[in-house]
């Protein structure tokens, strides 16, 4: 996948209006990243000085260690993958954005490692499914698949976990550290959104089918990874269904942005239906027998009934609207 020569033609590009807009956005990702660089050593040291080293019961400490060791290794994978992207992306603007991400991911990895050391718990080995998600993305030679795996799957999962753990205020140092990560990861997702539509538009029918199969395999492995983390997540008060709801909303936003850039992007592709059915099978909306769970998952895939993704997302949206209404009423007085 690596290039053995310099891309001397990177400036000989005649952009369409859409391509020029994407280029400006990617260049902006780079410059915003430069403006918002933060020193991980100083930030973590200041937070520990303010709150003291993390103090948690053994059960919560073990759970946080398991969850964020997955994040830590994901950051290392992201570091390696963003370096690969920097080499193979040809447009200058995309190369700049990917270069900015390399620096971000290096910082994310060493700061998370330092936090886990402060937590005082040896990070456990990765579970099979988490390792599979990272390995699939690292191993593929397809730029489109790397962007899908890194920018739009691994980064989205990380953002989802960061948001929910921060909302629950599980541990004060982590609660104040995670917004730095979230801000960076949101930019990284933006790079994938700008680059991937053009790559998909150039694919043959067979290549799109292969891409869809990879997409489903990757997402299925990610959900199985979440299932593996379920005991640890519930130990710190995180309902995996809430993560699915946040992830579903983020993915819906990404799909909407994709359709803006690539109008023929399908509204409800088959892999999305299968993914919804798998989520219903593993995280059912109600306690039922195994047979009923399978039948419910099939109905969700056929869009005959809403599944856990839609139901939990609607619940979360309703709670957010209720909180905003209460805030407005309280503010009025």
Residues covered by each model-derived region:
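Short linear motifs at secondary-structure transitions and domain/linker junctions
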Residues: 42-45, 136, 170
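Aromatic-anchored, glycine/proline-accented short structural segments
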Residues: 161-226
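Alpha-helical transition-metal enzyme core signature, strongest for iron centers
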Residues: 71-79, 101-116, 151-159, 181-192, ...
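Active-site-adjacent scaffolding segments
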Residues: 109-166
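Terminal targeting/low-complexity segments that flank the catalytic cores of oxidoreductases
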Residues: 1-96, 117-125, 129, 141, ...
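Short, well-structured alpha-helical segments
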Residues: 95, 99-102, 175, 179
């Amino acid at each position: 996948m690596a290039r053995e020569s310099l891309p001397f033609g990177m400036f000989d590009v005649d952009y369409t209006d859409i391509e020029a807009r994407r280029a400006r956005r990617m260049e902006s990702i780079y410059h915003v990243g430069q403006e918002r660089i933060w020193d991980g050593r100083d930030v973590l040291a200041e937070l520990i000085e303010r709150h003291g080293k993390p103090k948690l019961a053994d059960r919560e400490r073990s759970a946080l260690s398991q969850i964020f060791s997955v994040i830590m290794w994901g950051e290392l994978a992201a570091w390696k993958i963003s370096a690969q992207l920097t080499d193979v992306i040809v447009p200058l603007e995309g190369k700049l954005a990917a270069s900015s991400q390399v620096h971000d991911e290096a910082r994310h990895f060493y700061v998370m490692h330092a936090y886990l050391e402060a937590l005082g718990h040896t990070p456990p080995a990765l579970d099979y499914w988490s390792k599979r998600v990272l390995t699939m993305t690292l191993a593929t030679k397809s730029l489109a698949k790397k962007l899908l795996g890194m920018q739009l799957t691994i980064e989205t999962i990380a953002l989802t976990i960061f948001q929910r753990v921060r909302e629950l205020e599980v541990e004060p140092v982590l609660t104040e550290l995670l917004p730095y990560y979230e801000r960076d990861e949101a930019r990284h997702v933006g790079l994938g959104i700008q680059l991937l539509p053009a790559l998909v538009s150039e694919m043959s029918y067979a290549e799109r089918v292969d891409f869809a199969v990879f997409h489903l395999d990757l997402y299925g492995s990610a959900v199985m990874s979440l299932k593996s983390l379920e005991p640890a997540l519930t130990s710190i008060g995180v309902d995996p269904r809430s993560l699915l709801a946040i992830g579903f909303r983020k993915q819906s936003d990404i799909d909407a942005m994709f359709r803006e850039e690539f109008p023929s992007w399908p509204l409800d592709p088959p892999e999305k239906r299968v993914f919804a059915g798998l989520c219903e099978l593993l995280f059912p909306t109600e306690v039922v027998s195994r047979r009923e769970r399978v039948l419910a998952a099939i109905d969700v895939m056929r869009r005959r009934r809403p599944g856990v993704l839609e139901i939990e997302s609607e619940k979360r949206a309703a709670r957010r609207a209720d909180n905003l209404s209460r805030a407005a009423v309280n503010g009025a007085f």
